[in-house]
Curated annotation (Swiss-Prot):
It comes from Varicella-zoster virus (strain Oka vaccine) (HHV-3). Residues 154-244 are annotated as: Interaction with gE. A motif (Nuclear export signal) lies at residues 212-224. Pfam families: Herpes_UL49_2. Residues 157-167 have a biased composition (Polar residues). Residues 1-10 have a biased composition (Basic and acidic residues). The keyword Endoplasmic reticulum does not apply. Interacts with gE (via C-terminus); this interaction is necessary for the recruitment of VP22/ORF9 to the Golgi and its packaging into virions. Interacts with gM (via C-terminus). Interacts with VP16/ORF10; this interaction allows the formation of a tripartite complex composed of VP16/ORF10, VP22/ORF9 and VHS/ORF17. Interacts with the capsid-binding protein ORF44. Interacts with host CGAS. This is Tegument protein VP22. GO terms for biological process: symbiont-mediated suppression of host innate immune response. One of its GO terms (cellular component) is host cell Golgi apparatus.
Length: 302
């Protein structure tokens, strides 16, 4: 009976001295707790002292376990700055704090995905399909057809490129040509209005508000345009500041695209209407041959 008590006492002391590695990689003293075992007739029924923990061996294999553990002795290095032997309780605090932080994170994620407007959604680096990507609110919009060519400052021209070789104009081509046509009319109108205003002002400069009103009433420009390539040429020359050649060429023609007014009358732009539908179609298209022909005519007139 004495031997069994001695074995239990040795086992208790050995377990009390056992150290377990902490989360930081250093050894700490295991926490001790009293467990009352089953009553025994050989002792005073106070039980024995052991340790409850994950690394604690069962009482049956305790002797073999500690005999193996004692082959590699370990040096106890307390990690508690207070110097107490039992410093394993702070691990419970760390685990509790970790669980609390994880719970808060899960609650935030649930709130985000249940109500995206309440909390800002975390940005995702990529998506499987590019079409699923949300559009940026401040992303620049695509310019309408023809706006880029007009804003670039290059000479404008109609587009004659159909979608296929045999089909009629389709896709963005009509919108492009409409915008180019309106821009050409605007430039020609601005050039004519400038010349008419200068002529009216030079003929009789206004000296008061009443004369200015009469001048503005008489200087109203009635805008008409000439068809096809002449409109684009006039618009490009007006944009490049070569309106003098346009007016000179207009006076030399029989009908005259641009005619000067007599006296105080402003200059008006007159139009030569096409005779048939085929003329409209042929004049509306611009080719390299027509450009070369118009350039040769201009050189011959000069």
């Amino acid at each position: 009976m004495a031997s069994s008590d001695g074995d239990r006492l040795c086992r208790s002391n050995a377990v009390r001295r056992k150290t377990t590695p902490s989360y930081s990689g250093q050894y700490r003293t295991a926490r001790r707790s009293v467990v009352v075992g089953p009553p025994d007739d050989s002792d005073d029924s106070l039980g024995y002292i052991t340790t409850v923990g994950a690394d604690s061996p069962s009482p049956v294999y305790a002797d073999l376990y500690f005999e193996h553990k004692n082959t590699t002795p370990r040096v106890h290095q307390p990690n508690d700055s207070s110097g107490s032997e039992d410093d394993f309780e702070d691990i419970d605090e760390v685990v509790a704090a970790f669980r609390e932080a994880r719970l808060r994170h899960e609650l935030v994620e649930d709130a985000v995905y249940e109500n995206p407007l309440s909390v800002e959604k975390p940005s995702r680096s990529f998506t499987k399909n590019a079409a699923v990507k949300p559009k940026l609110e401040d992303s620049p919009k695509r310019a309408p057809p023809g706006a880029g060519a007009i804003a670039s400052g290059r000479p404008i021209s109609f587009s004659t490129a159909p979608k296929t070789a045999t089909s009629s104009w389709c896709g963005p081509t009509p919108s492009y040509n409409k915008r180019v046509f309106c821009e050409a009319v605007r430039r020609v109108a601005a050039m004519q209005a400038q010349k008419a205003a200068e002529a009216a002002w030079n003929s009789n400069p206004p000296r008061n508000n009443a004369e200015l009103d009469r001048l503005l009433t008489g200087a109203v420009i009635r805008i008409t345009v000439h068809e096809g390539l002449n409109l684009i040429q006039a618009a490009n020359e007006a944009d490049l500041g070569e309106g003098a050649s346009v007016s000179k060429r207009g006076h030399n023609r029989k009908t005259g695209d641009l005619q000067g007014g007599m006296g105080n009358e402003p200059m008006y732009a007159q139009v030569r209407k096409p005779k048939s539908r085929t003329d409209t179609q042929t004049t509306g298209r611009i080719t390299n041959r027509s450009r070369a022909r118009s350039a040769s005519r201009t050189d011959a007139r000069k």
